[in-house]
C-alpha cells in the first residue's frame, strides 16, 4: 500500500525487516526497554493470525511498525493491538495513523471486528 510519499505499508517479511523492528523498539523506548517483542514472536504472531507490519521508505528503511496478536476470549475472536512506533525522524507525517488504518483494513479482511 504505497502512499503519496512513496512510503509502503506491508507485513514484515525478511530477516532485515524483523531486525529493523527490534531496533526501532529500542530506539523508541530506550536500550534498556525490557518488553522488546523478539524476532521469534513477531514471526509467530503472523503465523497465528496477528499483525507485524511496517511502514517503509522508498529506500527500504523502516519508518514505523504496528504489532498485535489475535486470539479468542469468551468464544469471540478479537485482536490485541500491542505496539505501535514511528521513528522520531519520521513523526508528524501521519504514519502512525496510516499504520493503524492498515491494521484495521487487514483485520476487517480477516473478519475480525473487535480490537482492544
Residue ranges and their predicted role:
Residues 1-6:
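Basic/polar N-terminal segments that are highly enriched at the extreme N-terminus
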Residues 92-105:
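Conserved acetyl-CoA-binding loop-helix of GNAT-fold acetyltransferases
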Residues 107-116:
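Conserved GNAT acetyl-CoA-binding A-motif
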Residues 27, 91, 108:
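Short polybasic/polar patches that bind polyanions
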Amino acid at each position: 500500500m504505497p502512499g503519496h510519499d512513496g512510503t509502503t505499508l506491508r507485513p514484515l517479511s525478511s530477516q532485515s525487516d524483523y531486525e529493523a523492528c527490534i531496533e526501532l523498539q529500542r530506539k523508541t523506548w530506550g536500550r534498556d526497554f525490557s518488553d522488546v517483542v523478539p524476532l521469534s514472536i513477531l514471526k509467530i504472531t503472523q503465523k497465528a493470525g496477528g499483525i507485524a507490519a511496517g511502514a517503509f521508505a522508498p529506500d527500504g528503511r523502516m519508518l514505523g511498525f504496528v504489532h498485535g496478536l489475535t486470539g479468542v476470549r469468551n468464544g469471540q475472536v478479537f485482536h490485541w493491538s500491542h505496539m505501535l512506533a514511528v521513528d522520531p525522524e519520521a513523526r508528524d507525517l501521519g504514519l502512525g495513523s496510516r499504520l493503524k488504518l492498515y491494521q484495521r483494513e487487514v483485520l476487517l479482511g480477516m473478519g475480525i471486528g473487535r480490537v482492544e
